[in-house]
Structures are given as structure tokens and as C-alpha cells.
Amino acid sequence: MKPVKNRYSRITKKFPREFILLQGKGCFWKKCTFCDYYEDVCKNPFEINSKVIENITGEFGVLDVINSGSAMEIDPQTLDLLIEKVNEKNINEIWLEVHWTYKDKLERFSEKFKNKVVKYRTGIETFNPKLRTIWNKGIPEDVSPAEVAKYFKSVCLLVGTENQTFEDVISDINIAKKYFERFMINVFEENSTPVKENKLLINRFLNEIYPAIKDDPKIEISLNITDLGVG
């Protein structure tokens, strides 16, 4: 993956919040065909993460935390400092990103953030079960949108890779609108994996879908991986 240049961001549009990218211990899954984020690891993540956490001001009362895997894979020292900072800055709402496999551990993990509203997002990427299998997401094909929504308030959708169709994208957006409080759309950029961009699909998305949804308050769209200020 490309070197990370920035790990802290202030997002002021649609969903105002502080947004941080921490280093985890490395995603346990590491099998999604299009992803190389799990390479964002080092021997002492706390050394990096402590500096990122010090930037938190509590300005919006909302903090969004992502890392090179799932929130449960943040090292204990970093997690303790994060909780301390959340309390110190009177942050009331925390968003965390986790893999589907951790769904039954969300309630217990939320208890670490006492008296806070903790909401979770997962990288479902698509609601087309066959496509999820091609992408090796590690989410069973019989998992329905309604079941995902039992655990998660938000999802990430991926647009613009091989084997994906225009109809897939339309369907995914409509399903996400129906079931989730908010969601993110990430336009795929080629990275160190063998997966290639579907440039025709990306162009159709930009010309035929993006103009109609870009101002929707439920939807954040990253046309580039650093559009939210981290990466």
C-alpha cells in the first residue's frame, strides 16, 4: 500500500466529526481481494497512534475511528489512551469500523466506552452475495441486509472493480438507503493487489449516479482514498 501521509482529519460537511486513522495489529482476515490496508502495521503502533490521538479536540462531540483492520485489533495501550481522550474531551458519540466476523462482540466492546453512544460500520462492499464471494469478503452469502442492519448503523460500499455491474451499484445504494443510518461509497483505486479498475463502470457512476446522490446527507462519497482527509 501507499505510505500514509495523514492520520487526523476534521470533517465539517454532512456528518461533522473528527476522523482518525490508527494503526492496528493487522487485520485478522487479510483476504479481501482488492485490499492492502492490512499492510499498515509496525512493531510499536502506540508510538504512532498516541500522536494521532493527541490531535483530538472534541470539537464536534463525535469521533470516527478506523484502523488497518477492526477496532478490536487496536492494541490495548492505544485503546486505553483513546478512551481516556474521549472522556477528557467529552465526546459523546464514537463510530468504529469492524469486520462482520466480530458482530457478536460489539456489545461487549462498546462497554469499554462507558456512557457513550458507540456505533459500528462494516465493509460489506456489496449486497450481491456472489460478488462478495468473488471479493473474498468472508461474509456468508445468506447474510441479508436486514441482518447486517441488526449490528451495524453504517456500511462501506465499493464501486469500480472487475466483475461488478452498473446494476449492482444501483441496487447496493438503494439497499443501503433503506437499511442504514448512513453509508460510505468508495470508488476503487488500483493498489498493490492484482485487482483492476472497471473504468467504464466508474465513468458511468460519475456521470449517471454521482450527480443525483452527491448531496444526500446519508451518503459520503470518496472519489479518491484521501477524500476524507486521512490516508
Regions found by a protein language model. Give the residues of each.
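Alpha-helix N-cap and loop-to-helix initiation/capping positions
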Residues: 43-47, 74, 135-140, 164-171, ...
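N-terminal pre-triad scaffold of radical SAM enzymes
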Residues: 2-41, 60-67
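Core AdoMet radical
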Residues: 37-52, 59-76, 86-104, 117-142, ...
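Auxiliary Fe-S-binding modules of radical SAM enzymes
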Residues: 2-16, 59-60, 170-231
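Distinct, well-ordered alpha-helical segments
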Residues: 74-83, 103-113, 167-169
